[in-house]
Amino acid sequence: MQIQLHLYNTLSRTKEVFNPQDQANIKMYVCGPTVYDNPHIGNSRSVVVYDLLYRIVIKIFGSRAVKYVRNITDVDDKIIDRAELLGITINELTDKVTQEFHTNMAYLGCMLPNIEPKATEHIDVMIEIIERLIAKDHAYITDNHVYFDVLSAPNYTELSNRNLEEMFEGVRIEKSKTKNHPQDFVLWKPAKPNESTNMNFESPWGFGRPGWHIECSAMSYKYLGENFDIHGGGADLVFPHHTNEIAQSRCAFPDSTYAKYWVHNGFLTVNGEKMSKSLGNFITVRDLMDKDISGEVVRLFLLSSHYRRPLDYNDKAIEDAKKTLDYWYRAIENINVQKIDLPHNFMQSLLDDMNTPLAVKIINDYAKGVFIAKTEKERQLNASVIITCANFIGLMNQTPHEWFNSGVDSLYINELVNKRLEAKKQKNWLLADQIRNQLLEGKIILEDKSDGTTIWRKE
């Protein structure tokens, strides 16, 4: 039976069967970070969601058939402002934040994309596309800027499914007396006086830099061509970023449809509120790492809700994810687990528009199956299913011993355990009990075995 992936396509506003242009060459592009500040928990949701989609597509078509491109936006006004504020060079800032992004994503168990292009290394492709747009009367030069003519683009509002006036309500529009239409957006802008040369480049229209939207059109074209299969990003990118990408790419290449499937993940809030520095609820991935919260816990939290639905970060949600992983790891403890084929019901949940809440429930059901199993064979089968399914979605990459004892001083605990064993040999029951209670206060559980040895685990 042929495996079919169903994805909700924002472009058609329906769930569709994923039918790539070429099953031997699946093309996927995801908008990556703008490297001006450390990634926050909302940024990480997008990366984890598309990491899962990447894994699913690889499972169906094979790793050699999939090309996953995720860009680095290292040209942006926010980068200039941030570097100036910190008193460092632009390159120092972008290198530091890019490295932090990679560290954060490894912490969350994300696979690397096949290609991770930087905007600064593709200025020539951006210039090429802008020249095409000018030649086809979709862009114009004025006041040392190059603007895209929004009214020249067929079906400009197709992705957002709103009329032009509604789309721009509440959106900050760069005012210019020389723009043909207030909603026209910049493709190229001149450098400001005394501005860093690291963020500006020579072009046919003078020394300057590209607008944000042209960057992704250029990098997707460079590595995936005029047409590709999947374009992913956060719901906040539907307009204006993705809307403008479609417009300029289709106008530059009239025979192109650009991306066939548009996939968008929902917003993330913190304790029911929009995350912002002014509210004091801005949480970076580094903040979670510094609190010694396991990356697996954060990843499971991010997958606990359907990717298109809003997700709220709060202490209880993180605690629930930790308890769930504890339950799974406890279920496979002291069992000889083996990698097996993914069960049909689990795979079907992911093929149905990445229904991760159902996938998590299925793993929970198998964990319950371990504890109620009547035979060792049944326990082993259920435990093997747990580890196979969890590994597929990027979880349970530790042994139960490593999981339950992470963050503890094993040498110190072993020293106390040995000291207690010696006390028991000498029938010093008071000291033995004192050591047990001392470890218990640190949430370390001791278990005396019938052979005279003692094992320990974190509560």
From Swiss-Prot:
Residues annotated as binding ATP: 277
CDD domains referenced in this protein's UniProt entry, alphabetically: CysRS_core
Cell compartment(s), UniProt: Cytoplasm
Keyword ATP-binding: yes
UniProt keyword Cytoplasm, yes or no: yes
Residue ranges annotated as motif 'HIGH' region: 33-43
Cofactor: Zn(2+)
An example Gene Ontology biological process: cysteinyl-tRNA aminoacylation
InterPro entries: Cys-tRNA-ligase, Cys-tRNA-synt_Ia_DALR, Cys-tRNA/MSH_ligase, Rossmann-like_a/b/a_fold, tRNA-synt_1_cat_dom, tRNAsynth_Ia_anticodon-bd
GO molecular function: ATP binding; cysteine-tRNA ligase activity; zinc ion binding
Family designation: Belongs to the class-I aminoacyl-tRNA synthetase family.
Full protein name: Cysteine--tRNA ligase
